């Protein structure tokens, strides 16, 4: 690799600024002249990484209030449909708790049997400064208790006044509007800082009504509520409202940075078109204390954090609220208000979840030589969950149903990794991690029991029978997870790099996979975090998932990166993959104590089960300039994704695997304008999970138009998505259960019925304006 001259002072300043210590970078440094350096070592943790950074974020923020959607242009990343601010990212077909997702270093988990509040939903897109994604081959310092990859989200780093400036005051205010759903919102950020102290606030508010599809996709109007109907192109239960607040305080010295962040969120409502319930309230508070200390031998980082979530669910305005014989019974398309609340009359179905998460991390980074770096660290995470359903009448009567009581999931991990430059062209990173995961849950009861906490028999759907069996079982579980990774980068030439990685990853089952105990159809339907309309039952005998992944990236590019092409093939084999098997055909049948339901066209009940799986595919991404004309500089960007997943025990397809898809973008830069014409192509989906009766979807193509202009202190974004108002169905959006009698699986002419996938949004005209000061 050729050498080049580099002044010491700018190099030192750049390195110190990169470590978040601008105070050191800004101090006077004695000029030592010029030295020659050879093959500067990049961060090995950047291998197999994709980043959404400050350059890409502004245009993405204008189109969405869902932070997970900021990842939609990355190769290998797709989204599971959920609420308007709560999509779940998937990497190569592995999603949710198969990924390790952190927000400012905090490991967070959903606090809901439907996973309505996944980690990325706790930030507004305007609060995000950068997102790093490791697909499958994550270093052990960033991985753990996951098999699919890692997503790390960072909010804005603290800003400080420059030497001699005295104080720094800055901020921004923004607003947006999106026509489809009448979505609107505002955001505000402000900072006051001296050379050593920084204080900042960031707030954001977003609200939307239901969005419309690109055409009629259903044959009914009723919602289950008297006097309330929805147009046949309106996607029910897609409205939302969310408010986010963040306060940050930071202090720095020459070699130390201490930062405290407080995050508060309130979501008074968020609908879910692929779930039986809606979020009727969600309040969360997070406190995060971080220390970074530069020392002569390297760097020491420590963090402690705490989160508390109070979550409520019930039937939103597009779903039936009144149940029981006095409301018209199960065949009524609209439930009538009734009283008194009791065996014949139910007012909704309130469900509550409370979660407390406390964590700590410490990591030491030791530079042994100018070619070798060692990282060692330890982590603790303590997760507590209670999930109960208050009595509301009819079948939900007369006692409280405990879905999970005194749920516990504790993680303790240690790891070490070694990064070294074997030669000027070869960088390698190898690591080993051990993690112990302990889970437990307390005794439960259903709505019906003779003598608390459990006794007797019967109850709707075998509630008491199931509760007795669960309570008499040993519920304590211990899992010993091992995580190994080895990644390499070889620079073949100035225009060609190869990355090669091997990884062994392990994940312990979640609390809901283990402890959702009731086989009752209604209760099982409420325990679903994949949005397929089915009901799920936990399994105390689940083993941990064990995945082996091989991946490579072939990267051709210009020396100045003006053009580039990346190909990333990957292969993953998972032992004890947590899939599902069918329960019996009868509503009251224990699971799996009766012959499985053979249906191919209805919603089902399933129980989690360990099986084996295989996932493979190819990611392609590239960019190139096309021409420079009087109308500006034109370029082309391409992202292609192909993933196949198979259950090796049954030969069935894996659930929610995105079919072949491509995103082609023609870009234009002209006199301050950055514009794009985007074509999104998705193949029809027929390789589905038959055990779940997953719904097939047709292929489609969408055209999006995006324009933006930046002035010194003003930025304007506007555009049109789904320009031709195409009706299409989301391949990973789940089953449509967004309106009607959603508590159960009703008979015709009532709805919801199996067979309709959630449609994507129709034409949407959007605009966003940001003013900086």
Regions found by a protein language model. Name each.
Residues 215-235, 314-350, 388-402, 440-476, ...:
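Solvent-exposed loop segments that connect transmembrane elements
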Residues 277-296, 353-355, 403-411, 464-466, ...:
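Outer-membrane beta-barrel signature, preferentially recognizing the C-terminal barrel domain
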Residues 421-427, 436, 562-578, 583, ...:
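Gram-negative outer-membrane beta-barrel transporters
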Residues 108-137:
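Short acidic/polar hinge/loop motifs at secondary-structure boundaries
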Residues 214, 507, 580, 683-687, ...:
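C-terminal beta-signal and adjacent terminal beta-strands/loops
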Residues 242, 255-300, 308-340, 345-357, ...:
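Flexible loop and strand-edge segments within Gram-negative outer membrane beta-barrel domains
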Residues 33-68, 88, 96:
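N-terminal periplasmic "start-of-domain" segments of outer-membrane beta-barrel proteins
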Residues 159, 167-174, 178-185, 189-282, ...:
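Periplasmic-side early beta-strands and strand-to-turn transitions of outer-membrane beta-barrels
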């Amino acid at each position: 690799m050729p050498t080049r001259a580099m002044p010491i002072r700018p190099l030192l300043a750049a390195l110190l600024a990169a470590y978040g210590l601008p105070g050191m970078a800004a101090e006077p440094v004695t000029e030592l002249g010029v030295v020659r350096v050879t093959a500067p070592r990049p961060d090995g943790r950047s291998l197999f990484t994709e980043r959404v950074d400050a350059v890409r974020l502004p245009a993405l923020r204008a189109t969405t209030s869902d932070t997970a959607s900021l990842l939609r242009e990355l190769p290998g990343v797709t989204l599971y449909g959920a609420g308007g601010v709560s999509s779940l990212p998937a990497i190569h077909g592995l999603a949710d708790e198969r990924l390790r997702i952190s927000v400012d270093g905090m490991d967070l988990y959903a606090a809901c049997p439907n996973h309505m509040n996944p980690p990325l939903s706790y930030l507004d897109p305007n609060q995000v400064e950068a997102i790093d994604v490791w697909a499958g081959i994550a270093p052990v310092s960033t991985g753990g208790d996951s098999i699919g990859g890692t997503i790390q989200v960072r909010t804005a780093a603290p800003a400080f006044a420059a030497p001699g400036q005295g104080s720094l005051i800055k901020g921004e205010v923004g607003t947006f509007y999106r026509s489809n759903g009448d979505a609107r919102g505002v955001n505000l950020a402000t900072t006051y800082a001296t050379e050593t102290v920084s204080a900042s606030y960031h707030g954001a508010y977003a609200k939307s009504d239901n969005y419309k599809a690109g055409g009629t996709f259903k044959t009914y109007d009723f919602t289950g509520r008297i006097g309330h109907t929805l147009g046949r192109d309106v996607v029910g239960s897609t409205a939302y409202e969310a408010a986010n607040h963040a306060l940050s305080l930071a202090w720095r010295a020459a070699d130390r940075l201490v930062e405290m962040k407080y995050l508060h969120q309130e979501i008074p409502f968020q609908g879910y078109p692929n779930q039986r319930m809606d979020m009727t309230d969600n309040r969360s508070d997070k406190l995060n204390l971080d220390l970074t200390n530069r020392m002569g031998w390297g760097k020491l980082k420590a963090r402690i954090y705490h989160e508390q979530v109070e979550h409520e669910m019930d039937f939103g305005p597009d779903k039936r609220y009144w149940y029981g014989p006095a409301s018209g019974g199960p065949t009524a398309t609209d439930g009538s208000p009734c009283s008194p609340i009791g065996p014949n009359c139910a007012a909704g179905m309130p469900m509550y979840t409370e979660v407390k998460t406390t964590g700590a991390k410490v990591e030491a980074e030791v530079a042994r030589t100018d070619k070798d770096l060692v990282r060692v660290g330890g982590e603790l995470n303590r997760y507590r969950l209670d999930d109960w359903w208050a009595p509301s009448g009819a079948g939900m009567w007369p006692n409280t149903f405990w879905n999970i009581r005194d749920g516990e999931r504790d993680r303790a991990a240690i790891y070490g990794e070694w990064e070294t430059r074997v030669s000027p062209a070869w960088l390698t990173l190898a690591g080993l991690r051990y993690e112990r995961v302990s889970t437990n849950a307390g005794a439960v009861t259903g709505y019906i029991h003779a003598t608390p906490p459990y006794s007797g028999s019967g109850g709707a759907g075998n509630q008491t029978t199931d509760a007795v069996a669960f309570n008499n079982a040993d519920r304590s579980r211990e899992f010993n997870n091992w995580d190994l990774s080895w990644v390499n980068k070889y620079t073949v030439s100035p225009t060609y790099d190869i990355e090669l990685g091997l990884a062994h990853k392990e994940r312990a089952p979640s609390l809901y996979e283990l402890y959702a105990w009731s086989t009752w159809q209604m209760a099982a339907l409420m325990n679903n975090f994949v949005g397929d309309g089915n009901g799920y039952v936990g399994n105390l005998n689940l083993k941990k998932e064990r995945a082996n992944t091989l991946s490579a990236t072939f990267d051709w590019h210009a020396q100045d990166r003006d053009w580039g092409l990346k190909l990333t093939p990957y292969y993953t084999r998972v032992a004890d993959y947590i899939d599902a098997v069918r329960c019996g055909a009868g509503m009251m049948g224990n699971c799996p104590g009766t012959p499985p339901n053979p249906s191919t066209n209805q919603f089902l009940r399933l129980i989690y089960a360990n099986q084996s799986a295989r996932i493979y595919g190819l990611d392609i991404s590239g960019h190139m300039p096309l021409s420079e004309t009087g109308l500006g500089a034109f370029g082309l960007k391409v992202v292609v994704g192909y993933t196949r997943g198979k259950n090796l025990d049954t030969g069935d397809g894996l659930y929610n695997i995105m079919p072949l898809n491509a995103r082609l973008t023609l870009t234009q830069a002209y006199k301050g304008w950055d514009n794009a014409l985007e074509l999104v192509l998705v193949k029809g989906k027929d390789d589905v999970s038959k055990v779940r009766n997953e719904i097939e979807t047709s292929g489609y193509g969408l055209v999006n138009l995006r324009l933006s202009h930046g002035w010194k202190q003003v930025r304007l974004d506007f555009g049109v998505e789904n320009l031709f108002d195409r009706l299409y169905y989301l391949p990973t959006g789940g089953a449509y259960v967004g309106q009607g009698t959603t508590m159960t699986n009703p008979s015709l002419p009532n709805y919801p019925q199996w067979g309709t996938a959630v449609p994507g949004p129709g034409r949407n005209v959007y605009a966003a304006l940001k003013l900086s000061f």
